[in-house]
């Protein structure tokens, strides 16, 4: 039997969904050097691939920024396998993954990604260093590569039995997916895609602008803050130097500026939101900006925007595999 999986290997967070399980976690893998030590005696789950050991760690790295080269790297394959291991029940799996609009339009890239991921892979997992490791054989039979916002469309239109909900296939949509690296826009007439558009703006820009702003604010005090201090969540309250710093006002200003850039990108796409029945904001960025995005009469922020794409990808895989 082949297990169907929906997977979003984003630079910010991994989202993986199967029929009865799902997981969300920061996409940060750290390769172990052999000198790791913890006073508690554990460093967490260890993943071994191609004779190298890794742990999930907030100070680790993802497979890259905005370059399409990341999809064909060993790091991206490893991120995929670690994600699949969170939900795997069957040895054979079929995946749907999403890519930004601009990468989706690159000639032959979808085929190259599928060929890179498909095949038999071996991942070893242990609860800690030096503990007995378990072998996971992951045979990726099929890989479907789609544009990222399509996941939310599938999640909204189909229920878990893959039935169309309330004739939702008869309406027109604009899906605005605010991710870590990119914002991607999908316009449809029913289930037929009218237009896709992508822009290199995302929560990464909020983080970078935020860190620059608070360093400028605190420069006279010789305090210094990094992306690790604010974390992927862009915390308004930062704890460092034994103190608590409240940067709520600064963060809100940065977010408001980003939303203005977002509005400019939507206009640049040439998509008139008033011509569509429903505008759906999705992705982790939509949740992060829910206080700043001013919703029109036909606009909503998807209720579970962080997982919407991955859940829709699982439905897409299930439809394709029958």
Question: Whereabouts are the PLM-identified features?
Answer:
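Glycine-rich phosphate-binding loop plus the immediately following alpha-helix
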Residues: 186-225, 229, 233
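PRPP/pyrophosphate-binding module of the type I phosphoribosyltransferase fold
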Residues: 170-173, 178-180, 185-189
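Short, highly charged low-complexity linear segments
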Residues: 181, 185, 212-216, 318-322
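A glycine-rich, aromatic-flanked flexible loop/lid motif
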Residues: 179-183, 229-236, 284
């Amino acid at each position: 039997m082949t297990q169907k999986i929906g997977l979003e290997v984003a630079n910010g967070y991994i989202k993986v969904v199967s029929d009865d399980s799902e997981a969300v976690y920061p996409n940060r893998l750290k390769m172990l050097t052999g000198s790791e030590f913890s006073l508690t005696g554990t460093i967490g789950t260890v993943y071994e691939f191609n004779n190298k050991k890794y742990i999930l760690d907030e100070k680790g790295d993802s497979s890259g920024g905005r370059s399409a080269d990341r999809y064909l790297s060993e790091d991206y394959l490893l991120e995929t396998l670690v994600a699949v291991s969170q939900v795997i029940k069957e040895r054979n799996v079929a995946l749907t993954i999403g890519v930004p609009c601009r990468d989706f339009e690159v000639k032959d890239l979808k085929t190259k990604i599928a060929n890179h991921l498909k095949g038999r892979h071996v991942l070893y997992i242990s609860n800690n260093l030096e503990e007995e490791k378990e072998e996971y054989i992951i045979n990726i039979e099929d890989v479907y590569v789609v544009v990222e916002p399509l996941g939310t469309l599938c999640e909204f239109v189909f229920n878990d039995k893959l039935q169309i909900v309330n004739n939702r296939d008869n309406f027109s949509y604009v899906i605005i997916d605010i991710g870590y690296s990119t914002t991607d826009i999908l316009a449809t007439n029913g289930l037929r895609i009218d237009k896709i558009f992508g822009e290199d703006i995302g929560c990464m820009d909020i983080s970078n602008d935020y860190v620059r702003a608070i360093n400028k604010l605190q420069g006279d005090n010789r305090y210094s803050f990094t992306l690790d201090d604010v974390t992927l969540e862009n915390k308004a309250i930062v704890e460092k130097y034994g103190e608590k710093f409240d940067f709520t006002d600064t963060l809100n200003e940065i977010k408001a500026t980003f939303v203005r850039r977002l509005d400019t990108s939507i206009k640049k796409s040439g998509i008139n939101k008033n011509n569509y029945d429903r505008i759906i904001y999705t992705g982790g960025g939509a949740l992060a900006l829910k206080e700043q995005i001013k919703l029109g009469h036909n606009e909503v922020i998807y209720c579970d925007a962080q997982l919407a794409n991955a859940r829709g990808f699982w439905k897409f895989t299930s439809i394709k595999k029958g």
